[in-house]
Every structure is written in C-alpha cells, then in structure tokens.
Amino acid sequence: WRVGGVWFAQVVGFILGGTIGYSKAYLIVALVFLSLSVFIFFKMPEPERIVRPYISVFSHPGRWLKDSFVDPVLDLYDRYKSEVGLLLLLIFFYRLSDMYLGPMAMPFYREMGFTEIEVALVTNFFGTAVTIIGVFAGGLLVHRFGLEINIFYGAVLTALTNLPFVYLNYLGTDLDPTNELQFLWAVIGMDNFTQGYVGTVAITFISRVVSPTFTATQYALLVLLGTVPSRILGGSSGFVVNEFGYHDFFLIACALGIPAIVLSYIVWKKKLIFSSS
C-alpha cells in the first residue's frame, strides 16, 4: 500500500502533472485507487478476530480513563523509574532533525529548478527504493550489533545527511544543471537510506519499550511524542528560510540533531536496554 501510494500516486502523478496538468493527473490517480479499493473491499474476506469486552466511556468514564490512559502511563514510570525522562527525551528528539527539514524539501527542489519529472524519478521512485534498502539494512544491523549502538549511529546519520543539502544549495549558483541533478541523486540516496535505517531502529526501540499489556496505547503515545512536536516545529521552517535562506536552514536542521546524538550516546554507554520484559 505504501509503495504503491508513493510510486504510483507521486511518481506517476508528478509525471502526468507535468504533461497533462495536475487536475487531470489527480483525477486519474483517484480513479485508480478508488477502483482498487472497491475491488479489494468485495474480494477480500474479513479476518477472524477475538471480540473483547469493551468498557464504554459513557457508562464507566472513570474506569475507561484509567484503563485507557492512566494505567499505561503509570506502567511506563513503574518499569523505568528514573530513566523514564531519558526515554521520553530521546524519543522526542530522535527524528526532529529530519522531520524539521522535510516540509521544505519540495519547495527547495522547485527553487533549484528541477522539473516535476526529475523530482518524481529521483525523490520518489529512486528514493523509495533506497529507503526499502535502508529498512533491511537497519534490521540486519540491529540483529548483528544490538540496538543501543544503532540508536546512536542512527542519530548521527540523521543529522549528518542534512549537510549535503547545504552543498546542493551551493550548486544552485552553478551554471551547469547536470552537476545539480547528479548530486541530487547522491543526496537523496544518502538521505532516504538513512530514513529507512533510522525508521527501523526507531520502531525497534519503541517496540522494546512498550509493555505487552498496554501495547496499543503506549505505542501510540510514544509515536505521538516523536512526531507531533517535530511536525509543529516544522511549521516554522518556511519562516526560517525566508529570514535566513536555505543555507542556514539546513545548518539549523543539522544542529537540531545534536540533542538526539547526546542522548543516544548516554543510552549506548550506560547500556540502558529499554525492554518490556
């Protein structure tokens, strides 16, 4: 679903948009996905599931609040005690650098003069393929060397892969557009590989943290902690670009990764294995 969504909706959408216009391109993409959804809806049976007793928020609001939110939060504190602050801070800062840069990537490509087809092929088609490779690499490296050291190297790579964008911005003054496009392939390759690798490490980390008793609630809360604040902060990225330019913006995005590097180094050296067991 995700691969199809990126490769078809974005790659094909960009290519069609650059040739027949975005209104027709979006209509074609929507019709294809609608047709597939209807086909799957009627052809695939519902999986068997165990129906569990549900506590209604209206009939038992106090018990619902306790079971749904209070107990999962208290469980985290009971299991990690003094380390819970380190845990939450690491999750908060871990993807901040990458997510802060994300909203301004597409405006940057357009300002550099890349066409819709070039952006689609490099950032979406090639980028998604490299991300998948990064996912597998992350799984293999975590299995081979352990989680803590990969958390640290993931934080380092997340910050460092923002720096090539500084040089790509410098190439914007180059009169030869071939240099820009070639370096874009390299930048996207490094950045998307890191995203896949770091995504695997982050999912493994959070999966180790959550308790089997409160898996859904704790996982949702921790993922929320790691994504929503950075998304909100990312809303200021456009103002930073307008005020300081892309060069300083990419340096700021890199600097936002420093807290994650420090926190992950502490986790690595103290051998703090967050495990639900």
Say what each PLM segment does.
Residues 1-17, 223-234:
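Glycine-rich segments within core transmembrane alpha-helices of 12-TM secondary carriers
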Residues 4-42:
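Helix-loop-helix hairpin linking two adjacent transmembrane segments in secondary transporters
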Residues 17, 133-150, 241-242:
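Helix-to-loop junctions at the C-terminal end of transmembrane segments
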Residues 31-52, 263-268:
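C-terminal membrane-cytosol helix-exit motif in multi-pass small-molecule transporters
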Residues 48-86:
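Juxtamembrane intracellular "pre-TM" segments in multi-pass secondary transporters
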Residues 103-120:
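Short amphipathic helix-loop junctions that connect adjacent transmembrane helices
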Residues 116-118, 212-222:
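Loop-to-transmembrane helix entry/capping segments in MFS-fold secondary transporters
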Residues 156-177:
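C-terminal ends and interior cores of transmembrane alpha-helices
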